[in-house]
């Protein structure tokens, strides 16, 4: 609007109420582009709350709700209503992430054996395995954007705790051995992996607001299967080795997911770009997708695919909605939008029909 004033454009809406509604509509569009207080995109319902707050502030001086054409109207004005409608319509378009699946993980584990144990690929594979078991959100184990400096991880300044690192750090883990000995942090690797009976991880910062929640995991006796305990143990060993190279790594402040980058010869944090690059290459190899011709489809694999994949597998294996909510730390049934018609479900259906056909029907 300052630009308009500088060019001496005339106001097309000299009417105060109409001008105010235009401003509120532009504010809603501004918010929809990610210009919120947290500099990220927000839902249409949240945008309505932002606009409501702005309109309430204005009404405290003017005594008029400028969101409506007339004070007696029950609905939004003719300018603001279409903006709200389009925002909700845009949200309803399905743009779901594709699931990270066991086939992709099997390929990832084979590839990891070709790289040094402290390099990016083995670190990613361990992070993927943890995420698949615990339903990690991106910020719970990695960094958004290209943030890779181990001394500058993402922090949560909204919690009053000594540890404010958003991603889990070595000190967030504790174990109980088969001989009932307890240990935490980097001291865990002083034990042999085979004697660890239970492991707890503390999520100090969660999207659902349940800060400080702890989850229990046990060690999978199958050495080739998914195992949260084993993958964390390898990550702790990697952290300990890299700490020798970079003493700045802190068990209480530095995220667990670190790796050695040989080109600049330094320790780095795993970032979302690393995750997306590797996961999309895995998807391309498993599903025979070309990087250029299928680039739009490959964009649907990201860090969130770990949570989606875990949800799909648990549902296909017969876990109840309550079980999935509890295991993957959902506070609602929002995970339902991620479910897929996978081969496991089709096979389970046939088995159920065959068992039913073998029983007396009447």
What are these regions, as identified by a protein language model?
Residues 1-362:
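Extended, non-catalytic subsegments within catalytic or DNA/protein-binding/adaptor domains
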